């Protein structure tokens, strides 16, 4: 799920990819998505969930190597899916009595499937798009922003690696 934040403070869901794939195909689609998003949007952070235990650490290391050259984080998930979804859900719904929340969605072929999963959460069997949306939203609001490299040719840790 690709989410951005507009200058006016509203959020935009710009893309959703939801497919059942083999492990190798998942890695390939993640890499291709990183390539496409970087070309189209320039600065995109990719946040991937890290499963607990050694297998999760190994998988995270594998993704970091695969996605060298991209801004990538593998973050261990904590808490249940419902709790993790609450911050994004609050922005989606907005304040009680309001017509809409603070999230816009680009019109695209994936809209119906995306809306159906969000609307049936948490009772639905599939929760991947909700989980991915929550994770993307948390990444935007975590305050972990990265500055662009300076254009004057100077490059130092203070100006480039600021978090």
List where the protein language model places each region:
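Conserved RecA-like P-loop NTPase helicase motor core
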Residues: 129-131
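Residues within alpha-helical segments
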Residues: 86, 133-137
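Acidic two-metal-ion nuclease catalytic site recognized across multiple nuclease folds
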Residues: 137-163
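Mg2+-dependent endonuclease catalytic cores in nucleic-acid-processing enzymes, primarily RNase H-like
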Residues: 2-124
């Amino acid at each position: 799920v690709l989410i951005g934040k507009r200058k006016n403070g509203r959020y935009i869901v710009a893309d959703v990819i939801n497919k059942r794939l083999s492990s190798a195909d998942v890695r390939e689609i993640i890499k291709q998505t990183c390539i496409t998003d970087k070309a189209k949007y320039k600065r995109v952070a990719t946040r991937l969930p890290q499963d607990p235990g050694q297998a999760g650490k190994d998988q995270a290391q594998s993704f970091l190597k695969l996605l060298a050259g991209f801004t990538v984080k593998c973050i261990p998930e904590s808490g249940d899916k419902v709790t993790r979804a609450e911050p994004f859900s609050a922005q989606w719904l907005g304040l009680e009595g309001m017509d809409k929340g603070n999230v816009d969605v680009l019109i695209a072929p994936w809209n119906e499937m995306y809306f159906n999963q969000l609307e049936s959460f948490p009772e639905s069997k599939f929760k991947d798009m909700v989980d991915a949306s929550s994770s993307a939203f948390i990444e935007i609001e975590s305050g972990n922003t990265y500055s662009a490299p300076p254009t004057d040719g100077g490059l130092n840790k203070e100006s480039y690696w600021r978090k």
